Amino acid sequence: MTLNFWRMCTANLLLFASVYMLFPVLSFVMPEQLGMSVSRTGDMFLAFIAAMFAAGPFHAYLCDEYKRKNVLLSSAFVMLAAMAGYAFADSYLKLMLLASVQGVCFGLATTAGITVAIDITTSTRRSAGNLVYAWSARLGMLAGACAGFLLYDLYGFRTVVYAAVAVGVLGMYFASRVYVAFRAPIGLRLCSLDRFLLPRAWVPALNMLLIAFVPGVLLPLLY
């Protein structure tokens, strides 16, 4: 594993930590901030998921037409700007718009990050590299959620937002330090499901969805 690869793993960990610092906290802060029911605030997460998947068919084109690292950094920057907006959201519409923008950019940033990680890993080490890279995301989720709860208890919601943005900026710094060799565009279509929805991946994807569903439902309720 090269230094560039470890920089990408660190950037991935920080990116996921940044997003998951806010996720558990938003579920009970937004109802108070906006004066609406918890179930209605949950629409934000549905908007995030829908937007994240909506960006998928365009990922292959963007990473072919533009530099992969630039797609990652640009998406992460807009995502962090949307996350900062949660501190100032004062209506249901603004909440949904912020969640949608965050979802699109998070989807593009994570998929571009995976592409960069694969590009900088030798073919003989890609299986091990993919495993390490995936674990960096999992650790980022856990660390981010724990840090979010702790900061909220000690300092309040806005501190969590600012800390999440700061962590994301640090992740962008590590990603910007990665060297990615130039690859000539191959002329992919603007919208394509070829590298997004693979028929043989549906069963593992469903398995991961069901496993992640349990802690996703329980964590906000337990708090």
Kindly give the residue locations of the regions a language model identified.
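C-terminal membrane-cytosol helix-exit motif in multi-pass small-molecule transporters
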Residues: V165-A184
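Cytoplasmic helix-loop-helix junction between adjacent transmembrane helices
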Residues: S100-A137
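Helix-breaking motifs and short loop linkers at transmembrane-helix boundaries and internal kinks
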Residues: G35, K67, F88-L93
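Helix-loop boundary and gating motifs at the non-cytosolic
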Residues: T2-G42, V203, G216-Y223
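Juxtamembrane intracellular "pre-TM" segments in multi-pass secondary transporters
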Residues: M1, Y179-M208
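Paired small-residue
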Residues: A82, L93-V101
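Conserved MFS/SLC helix-loop-helix module at the cytosolic interface between two early adjacent transmembrane helices
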Residues: A54-A87
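Residue-level signature of mid-helix packing/kink "hotspots" within the transmembrane helices
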Residues: I49-P57, M141-L142
